[in-house]
Structures are given as structure tokens and as C-alpha cells.
């Protein structure tokens, strides 16, 4: 099993609002500066229809799981060199786990 903390939905919601909401949505399939995060778990990188990804994101071919998101969110530019995402990352493991929990719960909701 993974070493990812369980995550807290409410704390993750706060992290999302502070660090992600400016560029991403999780409650629709729309894109903003970044692609929708709704349904990201289980999706292959660079595949949201209508979003203009960098070649790096398209070519990475990673399937987003809790584990891959946990690693990615630590340092996006290290995980996918050449990504257009300007976010520096979340250094605290608990914040990454909380954010993943929030995205997971919100993605389970019907649109």
C-alpha cells in the first residue's frame, strides 16, 4: 500500500481554493487557464478535450492516480519537465493528501 496520508476533505477544499481555483475547476468539465480537475484520477495526462496542453504533458502518458498526483504535486516542473503549469508545488505531504481527497470527493459528484 502507499504511504500517502488519508487526507481531509475540508482542509483539501481550503488548499484548492487558495492554490488551484485561480486556474482550475473541479465542479465542471470546463477549462480555465488549466484543465478541469473533475475526474482527473484515472485520466491520462494531456487528454482533456479542448485544452491546449504542452507537448511535455501530452507525451508524459502518466495515468493520474492518488500516488502519481501525490508525487506530481510535490514539484510539477520536476515531474513533467516542460509543463506550462506555473504552480511551484505543495511541499507538505498532508496538504497534498488533503487536496487529493478533495478532488477525489468532488470528482465523484455528478455534473
From Swiss-Prot:
Binding site for heme c: 20, 23-24, 85
Gene3D superfamilies: Cytochrome c-like domain
GO MF: electron transfer activity; heme binding; metal ion binding
Entries under SUPFAM superfamilies matching the protein: Cytochrome c
GO biological process: electron transport chain; mitochondrial electron transport, cytochrome c to oxygen; mitochondrial electron transport, ubiquinol to cytochrome c
Gene: cyc-2.1
Modified residues (N-acetylserine): 2
Family per record: Belongs to the cytochrome c family.
Species name: Caenorhabditis elegans
Gene Ontology CC terms, in alphabetical order: mitochondrial intermembrane space; respiratory chain complex
Domain of life where this protein originates: Eukaryota
Keywords: Acetylation, Electron transport, Heme, Iron, Metal-binding, Mitochondrion, Respiratory chain, Transport
Protein name: Cytochrome c 2.1
Compartments reported by the entry: Mitochondrion intermembrane space
PTM annotation, UniProt: Binds 1 heme c group covalently per subunit.
Function as written in the Swiss-Prot or TrEMBL entry: Electron carrier protein. The oxidized form of the cytochrome c heme group can accept an electron from the heme group of the cytochrome c1 subunit of cytochrome reductase. Cytochrome c then transfers this electron to the cytochrome oxidase complex, the final protein carrier in the mitochondrial electron-transport chain.
Broad class of the protein's primary localization: mitochondrion
